[in-house]
Amino acid sequence: MIETQRLLLREYTPDDFDALYEIMSDAETMQHYPAPFDEARTRRWIEWNLENYAQYGFGLWAVVLKETGEFIGDCGITIQNIDGEMLPEIGYHIHKKYWRRGFAKEAARAVRDWAFQNTDYDIIYSYMKYTNVGSYSTAIANGMKKVKEYPDPKNTISYAYAITRKEWEELCDAEA
């Protein structure tokens, strides 16, 4: 489990389905995906993350408010195809009623720190559809820089942002 000032990030359980489905089936939340998720796709999402935990020791984690225990989204690290390479990527989905409160930034920063502290990766990515300003603003706020713009069959054009271990260490030193 990862803990931040306001959030807990924990492994998914099947009990998270209803709260996750509310997020993933919402057209506004999923506007940067080809389509919102149906029930089957949402169940598969949870199963995929349970498989990732078993295979890699990480995946997307449920994001819950510390104060209330309410499920507000997910955030974590998965292995994603970024312009033909399988790379470690921080992703996040936050319920729209919690947008613009810094929750994605807080969760993604905690995942970034966890990844550099608990894996051997020398670079961590986030990728998103070019129209997803909120997502790349979160990446920039967490020290990532745009490293690639590429055609992506899922997204028309995708942007990839990244931070290296060295850049992360320098950020940590500056914040200390």
Residue spans of the language-model regions?
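Conserved GNAT-fold acetyl-CoA-binding loop/helix
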Residues: E28-W48, G59
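Acyl-donor (CoA/ACP) binding surface of acyl/acetyltransferases
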Residues: M1-Q31, V64-A176
